[in-house]
Amino acid sequence: MDWTWRILFLVAAATGAHSQVQLVQSGSELKKPGASVKVSCKASGYTFTSYAMNWVRQAPGQGLEWMGWINTNTGNPTYAQGFTGRFVFSLDTSVSTAYLQICSLKAEDTAVYYCAR
């Protein structure tokens, strides 16, 4: 497999401070540059609209990088500097799920992506 033309996306399951609170993310993705990817984060064990949802990523060998957050009541997203344009936060409150979509993937998007309450 020619890894120079592929981008590996990893997502991780995260658990809240209380054992009944869970954020379960979709599985890892392998995408080519220029493609798009949509990561899901399904919440359970709490009222979804009572807490904002944050997105954070960690590139290989790097520290955590906060990407921004989405207001789960209004659906209004706030993006950190450097994450406007190709990055889209969205929600489906009927299934308590937040989404991160990345368009026009670049090699530098290779990272582990986390949702965080």
Curated annotation (Swiss-Prot):
SUPFAM superfamilies, per the entry: Immunoglobulin
Organism name: Homo sapiens (Human)
Domain Ig-like: 20-117
Name of the featured protein: Immunoglobulin heavy variable 7-4-1
Pfam families: V-set (PF07686)
SMART domains noted in UniProt: IGv
Assigned keywords, A-Z: Adaptive immunity, Cell membrane, Disulfide bond, Immunity, Immunoglobulin, Immunoglobulin domain, Membrane, Secreted, Signal
One record GO biological process: immunoglobulin mediated immune response
Record region (Complementarity-determining-2): 70-77
UniProt region (Complementarity-determining-1), positions on chain: 45-52
Segments of this protein annotated with the region Framework-3: 78-115
Region of interest: Framework-1: 20-44
GO-annotated cellular components: extracellular region; immunoglobulin complex; plasma membrane
Region spans: Framework-2: 53-69
